[in-house]
Amino acid sequence: MATNKERLFAAGALGPGSGYPGAGFPFAFPGALRGSPPFEMLSPSFRGLGQPDLPKEMASLSVETQSTSSEEMVPSSPSPPPPPRVYKPCFVCNDKSSGYHYGVSSCEGCKGFFRRSIQKNMVYTCHRDKNCIINKVTRNRCQYCRLQKCFEVGMSKEAVRNDRNKKKKEVKEEGSPDSYELSPQLEELITKVSKAHQETFPSLCQLGKYTTNSSADHRVQLDLGLWDKFSELATKCIIKIVEFAKRLPGFTGLSIADQITLLKAACLDILMLRICTRYTPEQDTMTFSDGLTLNRTQMHNAGFGPLTDLVFAFAGQLLPLEMDDTETGLLSAICLICGDRMDLEEPEKVDKLQEPLLEALRLYARRRRPSQPYMFPRMLMKITDLRGISTKGAERAITLKMEIPGPMPPLIREMLENPEMFEDDSSQPGPHPNASSEDEVPGGQGKGGLKSPA
């Protein structure tokens, strides 16, 4: 079992060697080793070493020794390296050529211009008489005449197409979906995690959106009406996250103490991930599970405060990943079941439980995007970003506690729990006014608390 000091060190950063098995998922790929040409390794002082001047009486002896010894040979000077290959100037613009491309000697600029023009079926227009002079100074002034010059000097359309098809074939062979087949066990795991996520978090298209005009146009320190609504929805979201955790294979097999430790550590991470997947960039809004849709200003006024822009920026960074529900569920599970959290009783057991989740996400993401091999590590890097946001969120809770008129809602309080942070609230254990009987954790022993998710 790792010591507290070791866990504290591990919790500082997410990456190989902490929560993830480093050997299984390397993110750094060493470059190919290159040997130095043998003659470049020799000191210049040893190249072409001649015989030193000798006295006349020794010269004949030296010559005789050299001629009669069959074992001693004077090394000849190394032949000079061949001169670098010189190509004719670019046939299109007369600039320095980098080689033969698409059938003619051409520079990198004209090679790239011709390739892009053919691959994208570009149609250009000449604003003069279609006889512009093309050289290295004027080549960017008229794309029409430059392309015509490419054809005139012999550049081949077919060579571009063949090159493109060859690259596509290589990518297809390297990343064929058949090479990322999932075992029956991983297929079953993915199905269970995906179902757990979908049944505890409806997708954006399933929600009936509605909006409010409350403080929609200007930022204020805190809109109490929006805060009450947000805290109510956040409480329900935490309950759903606990339910999600209980449905993950193996989670309830952990000790009760470790289940609570993992939930408290990751709950805010998963909450942020979930709300950010409901970001609509066209309107710059986020939608909650009941359909309430708030713009950036309203999110600020609902309690996010200075955290708002950081959360919206993260939501924007998720968009290029185009994660589906299965990937979001797997990433949430990996975020939750992580052995580098502090105060775990059995971190090794947690790590063992996380390994198949990592493998499932890796293979699923690669099978879904055969030509994008780096999507899996990019997803994992988002967990690091989420932890940074959660740290800022805990800091925001300190100032928010002084802005709201009553106590922090119980589940939110426990999610961010730091004994010193909420010491003044210890005498107010009652539920938040907006909390209902539904706010009790399923299977819990205490109302509104993360007492026992098992």
UniProtKB/Swiss-Prot annotation:
* Biological process terms in GO annotation: anterior/posterior pattern specification; apoptotic process; canonical Wnt signaling pathway; cell differentiation; cellular response to leukemia inhibitory factor; cellular response to retinoic acid; embryonic camera-type eye development; embryonic eye morphogenesis
Name where it mostly resides.
Answer: nucleus
Compartment list: Nucleus; Cytoplasm
Q: Superkingdom of this entry's organism?
A: Eukaryota
From the UniProt annotation, which stretches of this protein bind DNA?
90-155
What UniProt notes about the protein's domains is:
Composed of three domains: a modulating N-terminal domain, a DNA-binding domain and a C-terminal ligand-binding domain.
Query: In which family does this protein belong, per the annotation?
Result: Belongs to the nuclear hormone receptor family. NR1 subfamily.
Report the protein name in the record.
Retinoic acid receptor gamma
Organism encoding this protein: Homo sapiens
